[in-house]
């Protein structure tokens, strides 16, 4: 509870301070070393708002503009859709597990919004998708200008196996709107989603993030809030070794953020690892 109150006050201060700063773009080819260390191919976009002269830092600018399936990073906007459409009332509503073994212990249990976000519980979001419907989902996607705004699929979930796609650059643009409560949803819903995204927090910083994995590639997107401003990030990498490559997402991002002092080297005060 203390972390949630601190997070709200922290966000209000940061929003007021950095609403109208200027920004330049800088290619960080030197960040190749972080990808090479983990034998990974991918891109990262980092938007650093801690200074008056804000910076957009990019490794592999070409790939940063290429669209990929959002996979479970889509749970961020999908939760907003579900709240707005009434598919879920609040963070306390319980969704009963149907008893089907889905191969992951975190999925084989009753869920609420917090556990569904933390565990990337697909079956909960499949319930939301069915309740919302494709037509309304398409309207929501266009309304928030999310990637190609295409919720079509011939098989499976449209945010994993379907046509929906988004680039790392577009992920950053979306996250910034959410951070500032500028999306076309109730402010209390945007604040709730941001609360659900908290992964770690220290005395004067908060890390909010979400993983995603489509099978062939994986994401880690989010931001770190500091008193001087926030640092947004969106990474995607190829995952030819599938689950064996998943740890690389967070490892690369954390190494890069620490290299620009956007994450502290010390252990976090509170941690809630997301799959």
UniProtKB/Swiss-Prot annotation:
Active site: 72
Catalytic reaction equation(s): a beta-lactam + H2O = a substituted beta-amino acid
Domain of life, per lineage: Bacteria
First and last residue of the signal peptide: 1-21
InterPro entries named among the record's database cross-references: Beta-lactam/transpept-like, Beta-lactam_class-D_AS, PCN-bd_Tpept
Residue numbers carrying N6-carboxylysine: 75
Binding site for substrate: 210-212
Gene3D superfamilies xref list: DD-peptidase/beta-lactamase superfamily (3.40.710.10)
SUPFAM superfamilies linked to this entry: beta-lactamase/transpeptidase-like
Biological process annotations from GO: antibiotic catabolic process; response to antibiotic
Pfam families: Transpeptidase
Alphabetical UniProt keywords: Antibiotic resistance, Hydrolase, Plasmid, Signal
GO molecular function terms listed in the Swiss-Prot or TrEMBL record: beta-lactamase activity; penicillin binding
Family according to the record: Belongs to the class-D beta-lactamase family.
Protein name in the entry: Beta-lactamase OXA-15
